[in-house]
Amino acid sequence: MEVQAKLKFAKISAQKCRLVADQIRGLPVEKAINLLTFSNKKAAVLIKDVLNSAIANAEHNDGMDVDSLFVSTVFVDEGPTMKRFEARAKGRGNRILKRTSHITVKVAEKN
C-alpha cells in the first residue's frame, strides 16, 4: 500500500527540483532523509519536508512500520508560471519567468 504527500506551488523550477528527486527514488526512507539533509540544494529542503509528511501519514493514518518504508515514487510536475517584466536599457524590457512546481512523494512498505 502506498501513502503519499504533496507540496503544491513550491517556489522552485521543476527542472532544478527533479535533480534532487531522481537521487532519492527507490531508497529506504532513512537513507533518503540522510541524503537530503546533507545536500546543498534548495530543492532538498522542500523534498525532505514532503518526505517527512509522507512518513508521518504512513505511520499515523495507516499504522505502517517506519523502518520498512522506502520511497516508491517521487515526481515533480510544473506549476503555473508567473510572468514579470524587468526594465532594461534604452526603453526595452525583458520578461522574467517565476516558475513553480508540484512535488509528490509516495512511500510504501517493503515486503
UniProtKB/Swiss-Prot annotation:
Cross-referenced InterPro entries: Ribosomal_uL22, Ribosomal_uL22_bac/chlpt-type, Ribosomal_uL22_bac/org-type, Ribosomal_uL22_CS, Ribosomal_uL22_sf
GO biological process, one term: translation
Keywords of the record: Ribonucleoprotein, Ribosomal protein, RNA-binding, rRNA-binding
SUPFAM superfamilies attached to this UniProt entry: Ribosomal protein L22 (SSF54843)
Cellular compartments per GO CC: cytosolic large ribosomal subunit
Signal peptide: none
Record bears the keyword Ribosomal protein: yes
One function term, GO molecular function aspect: structural constituent of ribosome
Keyword Ribonucleoprotein in record: yes
Domain of life: Bacteria
UniProt-listed PANTHER family: CHLOROPLAST 50S RIBOSOMAL PROTEIN L22-RELATED, LARGE RIBOSOMAL SUBUNIT PROTEIN UL22M
Function: This protein binds specifically to 23S rRNA; its binding is stimulated by other ribosomal proteins, e.g. L4, L17, and L20. It is important during the early stages of 50S assembly. It makes multiple contacts with different domains of the 23S rRNA in the assembled 50S subunit and ribosome. The globular domain of the protein is located near the polypeptide exit tunnel on the outside of the subunit, while an extended beta-hairpin is found that lines the wall of the exit tunnel in the center of the 70S ribosome.
Family according to the record: Belongs to the universal ribosomal protein uL22 family.
Subunit organization: Part of the 50S ribosomal subunit.
Protein name as annotated: Large ribosomal subunit protein uL22
Native source species: Francisella philomiragia subsp. philomiragia (strain ATCC 25017 / CCUG 19701 / FSC 153 / O#319-036)
